[in-house]
């Protein structure tokens, strides 16, 4: 599962996920991409589940790039613990996703196979996505 090797601080503020993605919004590595239309958080488990679904479908052909990385820690307090006594411990890591962000890219397979693989991956994700094709010259 993806998570930072080490961080400067263990805990982060919750923050607000606003705006649209301008960086990481184009197909840069492969021929096809899965782009987020909705906004939300992707956990490292969701990223891995979608990657497995795609990898299983394309079998041995093609190459997949993961364009997002979960670098934000989410803390939780244990069950049945009274309020107060400080912030809970980091339990998992998430990637904050804005609309327009490229999530995955794929190359070395034909379009119909890529579409189906991304459809299977999108079912594992908590936000709306769309299939995009890299246009030559961009």
Curated annotation (Swiss-Prot):
NCBIfam families: rplP_bact. GO terms for biological process: translation. Pfam families: Ribosomal_L16. Coiled coil: none annotated. One of its GO terms (cellular component) is cytosolic large ribosomal subunit. Belongs to the universal ribosomal protein uL16 family. The keyword Secreted does not apply. PANTHER family: 50S/60S RIBOSOMAL PROTEIN L16, LARGE RIBOSOMAL SUBUNIT PROTEIN UL16M. Transmembrane segments: none annotated. Keywords: Ribonucleoprotein, Ribosomal protein, RNA-binding, rRNA-binding, tRNA-binding. Binds 23S rRNA and is also seen to make contacts with the A and possibly P site tRNAs. PROSITE patterns: RIBOSOMAL_L16_1. This is Large ribosomal subunit protein uL16. InterPro entries: Ribosomal_uL16, Ribosomal_uL16_bact-type, Ribosomal_uL16_CS, Ribosomal_uL16_dom, Ribosomal_uL16_sf. It comes from the Bacteria. One of its GO terms (molecular function) is tRNA binding. It comes from Nitrosomonas europaea (strain ATCC 19718 / CIP 103999 / KCTC 2705 / NBRC 14298). Part of the 50S ribosomal subunit.
């Amino acid at each position: 599962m993806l998570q930072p090797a080490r961080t400067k601080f263990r805990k982060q503020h919750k923050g607000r996920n606003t705006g649209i993605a301008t960086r990481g919004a184009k197909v840069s590595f492969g021929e096809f991409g899965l782009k987020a239309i909705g906004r939300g958080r992707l956990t490292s488990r969701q990223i891995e589940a979608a990657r497995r679904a795609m990898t299983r479908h394309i079998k041995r052909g093609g190459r997949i790039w993961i364009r997002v990385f979960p670098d934000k820690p989410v803390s939780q307090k244990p069950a049945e613990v009274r309020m107060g006594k400080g912030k809970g411990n980091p339990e998992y890591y998430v990637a904050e996703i804005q609309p327009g962000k490229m999530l995955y890219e794929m190359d070395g397979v034909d379009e119909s196979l890529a579409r189906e693989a991304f459809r299977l991956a999108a079912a594992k994700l908590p936000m709306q996505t769309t299939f995009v094709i890299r246009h030559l010259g961009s």
